[in-house]
Swiss-Prot record:
Protein name: Putative cysteine ligase BshC
Function noted in UniProt: Involved in bacillithiol (BSH) biosynthesis. May catalyze the last step of the pathway, the addition of cysteine to glucosamine malate (GlcN-Mal) to generate BSH.
Entry's Gene Ontology molecular function annotations: ligase activity
Enzyme Commission identifier(s): 6.-.-.-
Length: 538
């Protein structure tokens, strides 16, 4: 493998944050400097954590996942007051979801190791599975290349319900059939059978979406020391109840903190992305087997548009009696992570970084500092055949990342022709239109009854011109079919659906192409945290 870095333009909060703009950096409590990380360590040492309870739960959970010894040792290390975590999280996507989930894990593993060495303290990597999430449309699919098109393939649950990913049962046989259909679109390689068995072993041990995700991530990162936590696990939820009570008691201050911080963001010229109702409590409650966001109305906590109502005392009692009924939303999830773990750094994608900029005053409301927020590593893989296509088309490696591939294709095609087809036909259409306008005026003057026919005559002439243009383009494209297919392959591989590769492609494609140790070999590469995009030639 060969790794290169390129600067890819970013926008909004992310761009200004990475460029060191003081105004947006003031929305975060720590800058990304070594001194700031030392200050973070000092601040964490001033706080108390219920480490032993968390360790007991994580040992049981990761042992059930058959995690490696390095993971279990890292869990035990969390019991020591001088151990800290680098954390990231994601929904439990089928087959681990898009590549950026894998890249988040790589990011926390890399940063944890680097900070352990530079700060001289134990730092362990933790991945927070958003098991409470109930939006199945976010996790029930993957993308694949089929019939020269990128297509979304959805796993249709035969018994869908508005439950969390931790509680949504997965039909193993149906999912196995779905996975086999996906692998049929991959090239048959020496690794295919092993990868299918690898995935099936994880599936066989799973009852829910989170189970499948957790088993697969554990197997992919078997010897890395990665710790997994299911945010909706009932045993974890018991440990979180004191903080849920704090959120309920401070829900007005939490909402006010969010609104005030969003006003700061607006004044800086950014558009807030967290949308909440004015009376939101920022806690979900399971009601009638559905996850319902609570709101406050006239001193009562209500759900389902008032169909269910609770007093403060009733809600607290229910939390103590049935803690698993409660879960966080986008605002309180970061707070809960901060409550549970001694977080040295949080790693997030561009969207997460933007919405975390809206949470500073919310953190302060509950007595926390926002941890250092580190943008995750961004990575694109370039297979040898794609590198060859780029070379054959005389494109630079950075071109597909800095330009629209369709535009590159059009420019290349135009350069193969003496005169651009579009320009020539536009000129012809304009000249014909001018001539026909004069002709129609003449017809109307001589015989007004033929005016409508003259108008139809112009339409037919235009139709014939457009038909000629399409036929000419079709013939030209056929002439350069080999080269244009290279553009198609480049787009599928590097910018599928016009998006970054890591937002569309799934890791299983690369495991199938390069073997089960693919991710391990990726992690051997040196990565930097300067916001540049990493291009890895395979």
């Amino acid at each position: 493998m060969e790794i290169k870095e390129i600067s890819v333009p970013q926008q909004g909060v992310v761009a200004d944050y990475m460029n060191g703009k003081k105004e947006i950096q003031s929305c975060f409590d720590y800058m990304l400097t070594e001194d700031a990380f030392k200050q973070r360590l000092h601040d964490l040492r001033e706080r108390e954590f219920f480490r032993q309870d968390v360790v007991a739960h994580l040992l049981e959970y990761n042992t059930k996942l058959q995690a490696g010894e390095s993971t279990l040792q890292n869990v035990k290390a969390l019991g020591d007051e001088n151990t800290y975590v680098v954390i990231a999280g994601q929904q439990a996507g089928l087959l681990t979801g898009p590549l950026y989930t894998i890249h988040k894990v790589i990011s926390i593993l890399k940063l944890a190791k680097e900070k352990e060495e530079s700060l001289g303290v134990k730092v362990v990597p933790v991945f927070w599975i958003a098991g409470e999430d109930h939006d199945m449309d976010e996790i029930n699919h993957t993308f694949l290349a089929k019939n020269k098109k990128m297509k979304k393939t959805i796993f249709y649950d035969r018994n869908p319900k508005k439950a969390s990913a931790s509680e949504s049962e997965l039909s193993v046989e149906d999912c196995r059939n779905w996975i086999e259909e996906i692998f049929k679109t991959y090239p048959e390689t020496n690794f295919t059978k092993d990868v299918l068995k690898f995935v099936d072993d994880a599936l066989e041990k799973s009852n829910t979406y989170v189970d499948f995700f957790a088993h697969l991530i554990t197997k992919i990162f078997a010897n890395s020391g990665l710790i997994l936590v299911d945010s909706h696990h009932p045993e974890l939820r018991k440990l979180e109840i004191p903080f849920f009570k704090r959120i309920i008691s401070k829900y007005k201050e939490v909402q006010e903190g969010l609104r005030n911080q969003q006003e700061v963001i607006k004044e800086l010229g950014y558009k807030p992305i967290i949308e909440t109702k004015s009376h939101a409590v920022h806690i979900f409650m399971e009601i009638d087997n559905e996850r319902v966001l609570l709101e406050e109305h006239q001193g009562k906590f209500v759900g389902k548009d008032g169909a269910h109502s609770f007093s403060y005392e009733e809600l607290i009692e229910e939390m103590e009696r049935n803690p698993a009924r409660f879960s966080n939303n986008v605002v309180t999830r970061p707070l809960m992570q901060e409550y549970v773990f001694p977080t040295l750094a949080f790693i997030g994608g561009p969207g997460e970084l933007a919405y975390w900029s809206e949470l500073q005053q919310v953190f302060h409301t509950v007595g926390f500092q926002m941890p250092p927020v580190v943008p995750r590593l961004t990575i694109t893989y370039v297979e040898r055949c794609i590198a060859t296509d780029l070379f054959d088309l005389q494109l630079r490696e950075s071109d597909p990342f800095l330009n629209d591939v369709d535009k590159l294709r059009e420019n290349w095609l135009s350069n193969q022709i003496e005169e651009p087809i579009d320009n020539h036909f536009e000129k012809a259409k304009k000249e014909i239109a001018d001539i026909h306008t004069s002709l129609q005026q003449f017809v109307k003057k001589i015989e007004p009854g033929l005016s409508a026919f003259a108008g139809k005559n112009e339409l037919k002439i235009n139709e014939q011109i457009e038909l000629l243009e399409r036929m000419l383009k079709r013939n030209v494209e056929k002439k350069y079919e080999v080269q244009l297919n290279k553009f198609r392959r480049i787009q599928f591989a590097l910018r599928p659906l016009g998006a970054p590769q890591e937002r569309v492609w799934n890791v299983c494609y690369y495991l199938n192409q390069f073997g089960l140790d693919f991710v391990d070999r990726v992690m051997e590469n040196p990565f930097s945290w300067d916001g540049k995009h990493h291009v890895i030639k395979l």
